Amino acid sequence: PLGLFHSHKMAPRVIISNGLMVGTFDDQENFNRAAALGVANYGQMTAGGWMYIGPQGIVHGTFNTLLNAGRLKLGIPNDKDLAGRLFISAGLGGMSGAQGKAAEIAGAASIIAEVDDSRIDTRYTQGWVSHRTDSLEEAAKIALEHQKAGKPCAVAYCGNIVDLLEYLYEHNVHVDL
């Protein structure tokens, strides 16, 4: 165990440490044993495999993933961000709702397609996206203006990602990520 703690009847009964394995026990064999016993799990990028906390738990990992993809695929130096780059993706649900904000933090202009307008309402109201539209032309216009200016933005497009990608292809819009 991570530790033993004095508590009372109203105290939480689980202290989450995800996959924290230290010292002599920091190897794959011991992790697999602890996971099989149900006392450790692989936490990935969020608050842990035992809980769901929505986009705030994934925004940092998504931001890092976008920056690293830019560095790996686009040759962006470690001291630069995604300014002047266009990121396209889909989904503004629970976990995917972080994509627009992560792209903005990373400096990219982005369009995130989502077919469920209620998801867009939520993300727009909460500030996870900065623009919303159901027009392919308007979504592209906003994102491309921001991209050209080197300014970040997150455009929520209410529609299918396939329609968005076809539109961008037909209009010779280069998608960086």
Q: Over which residues does each language-model region extend?
A:
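Generic structural signal of hydrophobic/aromatic residues within well-ordered alpha-helices
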Residues: 10-12, 16, 62, 120, ...
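A general structural signal for short secondary-structure junctions and capping/turn motifs
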Residues: 4-8, 79, 101-103, 145-148, ...
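Active-site proximal loops enriched in glycine and acidic residues that flank catalytic Cys/His/Asp
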Residues: 114-115, 157-159
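Catalytic or ion-translocation cores adjacent to nucleophile or general acid/base/metal-coordination motifs
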Residues: 44-50, 54-64, 83-86, 92-152, ...
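Sequence-level detector for tyrosine residue identity
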Residues: 42, 52, 124, 157, ...
